[in-house]
Amino acid sequence: MLFNINEKGEPLVISFAPFLSPEAIKHLQENERCSDQSQKRTAQQIEAIYTSGQNILVSASAGSGKTFVMVERILDKILRGVSIDRLFISTFTVKAATELRERIENKLYSQIAQTTDFQMKVYLTEQLQSLCQADIGTMDAFAQKVVSRYGYSIGISSQFRIMQDKAEQDVLKQEVFSKLFNEFMNQKEAPVFRALVKNFSGNCKDTSAFRELVYTCYSFSQSTENPKIWLQENFLSAAKTYQRLEDIPDHDIELLLLAMQDTANQLRDVTDMEDYGQLTKAGSRSAKYTKHLTIIEKLSDWVRDFKCLYGKAGLDRLIRDVTGLIPSGNDVTVSKVKYPVFKTLHQKLKQFRHLETILMYQKDCFPLLEQLQDFVLAFSEAYLAVKIQESAFEFSDIAHFAIKILEENTDIRQSYQQHYHEVMVDEYQDNNHMQERLLTLLSNGHNRFMVGDIKQSIYRFRQADPQIFNQKFRDYQKKPEQGKVILLKENFRSQSEVLNVSNAVFSHLMDESVGDALYDEQHQLIAGSHAQTVPYLDRRAQLLLYNSDKDDGNAPSDSEGISFSEVTIVAKEIIKLHNDKGVPFEDITLLVSSRTRNDIISHTFNQYGIPIVTDGGQQNYLKSVEVMVMLDTLRTINNPRNDYALVALLRSPMFAFDEDDLARIALQKDNELDKDCLYDKIQRAVIGRGAHPELIHDTLLGKLNIFLKTLKSWRRYAKLGSLYDLIWKIFNDRFYFDFVASQAKAEQAQANLYALALRANQFEKSGYKGLYRFIKMIDKVLETQNDLADVEVAAPKQAVNLMTIHKSKGLQFPYVFILNCDKRFSMTDIHKSFILNRQHGIGIKYLADIKGLLGETTLNSVKVSMETLPYQLNKQELRLATLSEQMRLLYVAMTRAEKKVYFIGKASKSKSQDITDPKKLGKLLPLALREQLLTFQDWLLAIADIFSTEDLYFDVRFIEDSDLTQESVGRLQTPQLLNPDDLKDNRQSETIARALDMLEAVSQLNANYEAAIHLPTVRTPSQLKATYEPLLEPIGVDIIEKSSRSLSDFTLPHFSKKAKVEVSHIGSALHQLMQVLPLSKPINQQTLLDALRGIASNEEVKTALDLKKIESFFCDTSLGQFFQTYQKHLYREAPFAILKLDPISQEEYVLRGIIDAYFLFDDHIVLVDYKTDKYKQPIELKKRYQQQLELYAEALTQTYKLPVTKRYLVLMGGGNPEIVEV
């Protein structure tokens, strides 16, 4: 029961406005359009905020205000009576959830201040209080809630932890893999399994490649709705389906025919060029022209008549015919310019070549794939079993548990579906199929609100599938009854210079084939305000390319990293912006594709004095010097006979032994022993029994004694103390923590050392104990080529930002530099020995023995790696998916800019050439060309070249070495120091003086009204004492002191592994039990146990409840029997809220709380409150809680206009239950 009352004691009734009809929304849109507001909401924003009663997909372009729309929609729901806790709001990151929560909080505060309706104020205040418990967060966080609450239904304990550290996951995986591998190597099908391992690893001894295959298959399966079913039903889908030429998908045939036709068209374009030379001097056709005409005609004929001439069964014959028809080279040369006419077709032919042979051998690899399927399934089950045993899971496990709970428990699923008024999702384009399934289970089928942008889907490496968004988009447009699509196209972030160049680039680049979205009028960016359309000539986008014709060799050898010259170009532009236009450094951001190989940027910027902060680099925590020193110290403490670790410790700054010292120690060998460790030599050196005691001088002897004494104390402490304390003892004993503070990058070094102590502490808290296990865990991390996350330290605010494009998503910056545009897209995945696909399953390269094709030969075997047909199909899809994501990455990078965007790259000016005739092209770059180009820079140059007659809103400029001299780059202007005497005429100094006066006045007001300032709008009875005790004078006020425990209460700590159950948790469980306990039945142990199963507490807390004491209360006390006799008059766990006046500040506030139990009769009320506090005398608790019960009584009296005649405390913290009347 929930009751709110006003100052007169009357119940509050709030009348909420209904949701808007489509007609009302149109009327609101018209009013907004005609209003004189400076910043108006768009018609689409209004539609997205107020439309209700159906599924809604909001396609929100960059900078279109999607967060604003979500916040406004949430607030509108609240104002129309939907409590915030009835909204499910999913965000992509924890940070986004925090920001969204803060925005809602600010909106609620603003709404409370604006409204004059008292009932609404109280309601909104309650929403504000509920905000912190509302379901606003990531899908992972919500899944954890579901499993914590209902995990028992599928046998999962609620007391689990999340393995967020990849290193810990890899250690467990390695243990499971090794055990399973040995089992499979000794099974009945061992020969087939060995062939499988050799297919990927070459031999059975080096299993690293096979292990990586298994891990990848496992991880991929975890992103599906049901990993086990996917592995059983989809993993071998393509291998079972594509076994003949006739099985090749029509789409792939169409792509081949399209490449043939495009080649014919491009070749015709080339032959039509003026300088081509169709005729000889005699006027007849040239041999070259005749040959090319034949190619054009035959390619066109074969495409047109493919079905009757070849068909799928004759595909292999078509491949041979085309291969014999076209030249082996890629280019056609006209006037010394090479045109890559045949390049794309050659790539397609390569894909389909030798199909008959491949299909003949492909069937031989099927038993291997079945073994792989069995192994991955077994690995998944075994790995999960280990995690269940450790009660430690990955996020994907928790999500699958949540799905299983909702699928298998109809009552739980329906309770969520009935509870949530709306299921809202931000960044919907980055969902995977596992998350989509969870959202489907939470929704009632017509209450989903999804916000996203297909053009900003850039998390494929996390198994995000943009096709989920695309499918919804298409379905809702074709069938409006399923849902509504709302487009937010207006951009409120960027100036027209940025919007125009973005539209120009992607209208020529992006479509459904590459990019997954046709960049037409639906997706083009539109300025949201007039101010954004004001032109600035100096903000036109620029593609700045270092001319590599005379490259000085400063670029990395693999051409993947950014060169010094490119960074210098950026530095030059930044200096110009800062000096000439006064642009602060923090307004400038550099975007890169990856975190690696960016040291040259920091180094170059330091040379020019440009401050820069980065979002981190490669994980090198365990490789940092200070951490390596500490790890070797711990290794030495664990085992002093580890020579490598011992030498590292001796050479470290903690003991500072030099090479001469170590040489003298090394010569103290015992001649009778073949192998003698360094630790033994140190001990012999100290007692003078080494082979050459004369080499140990007094200074060295002193150092050795100090070392052994220190090491002995550390080893003794390691047996008794915690890892955390041991590490800090090492820091303090040898002052190592203080030492690193004097070195370069002191902040980072100290942060790393501090983190080591924290991680050791976390390691022990997770159930692992001891120095040996910690060292073993670290060594396993290093063995698996992993590292721990780097520690972040505070960065300067006034500095240029360097971050990855992924990290920049959702952010905006005035000036954006997109660096390393000449870096080739990573195509590593499409060259692996296997490729996974959600629909097709796995495709592999099969190492076939083709000895039979060669006839007689003395060779035992002839192995050839073949791309199986499933592999080729997966490869083509993966290539397009990779290019599409790179295109979307470029879109994200460009749309971060508010004022200007720069593209930085490197190219040869002399090799820059025309690609094809623009007159023969449509709006888009040809598909074959977009597939062929593999850098941002190539795309931009192709657009600039082919569509040169259009205004593309960006300029291409080549930078020479002469433009990058020290004089040309310039230097930063340093601000001059002001003369203090000049401040006397400075207006700003007067303003500062007035501001200081105002601050002083504010401080005085704060002091006078301190009680009101510290008084929240809503308080609970138990909080009142904590609020007023430090603020009120003690005159006339009774301060209820907490009773302190006497010394006789002291008990020795328990050294068991089980954590002590908190008293507050026991109290909470007691209240839940008393609320659900059926009083119509006899109260006995069985009744209590049945009721106990229905409360949401963990088993440890339930076990800690003293059920005999509760049974005694009901059976042996008159009040307990009173509960059963008058149960019809009983109200349990009843919330209340009343308005009270603060005696000090005279400010009104809402007092709210929950009454444990009360009996409502016709003429009076009886109040009951349970307490689990420990006590010596009951009078202690009576004094402590008297004021609280008075407040409860006041609330009941104001509500029912009846007196509270009896107030009882039920004390459960003693030996037996006691009843105290207050």
UniProtKB/Swiss-Prot annotation:
GO cellular component: cytosol; DNA helicase complex
GO biological process entries: double-strand break repair via homologous recombination
Lineage, highest ranks first: Bacteria, Bacillati, Bacillota, Bacilli, Lactobacillales
PROSITE patterns: UVRD_HELICASE_ATP_BIND, UVRD_HELICASE_CTER
Record's function text: The heterodimer acts as both an ATP-dependent DNA helicase and an ATP-dependent, dual-direction single-stranded exonuclease. Recognizes the chi site generating a DNA molecule suitable for the initiation of homologous recombination. The AddA nuclease domain is required for chi fragment generation; this subunit has the helicase and 3' -> 5' nuclease activities.
Gene3D superfamilies xref list: 3.90.320.10, P-loop containing nucleotide triphosphate hydrolases, PCRA, domain 4
Residue span, UvrD-like helicase ATP-binding domain: 39-495
The family this protein is said to belong to: Belongs to the helicase family. AddA subfamily.
Name of this protein: ATP-dependent helicase/nuclease subunit A
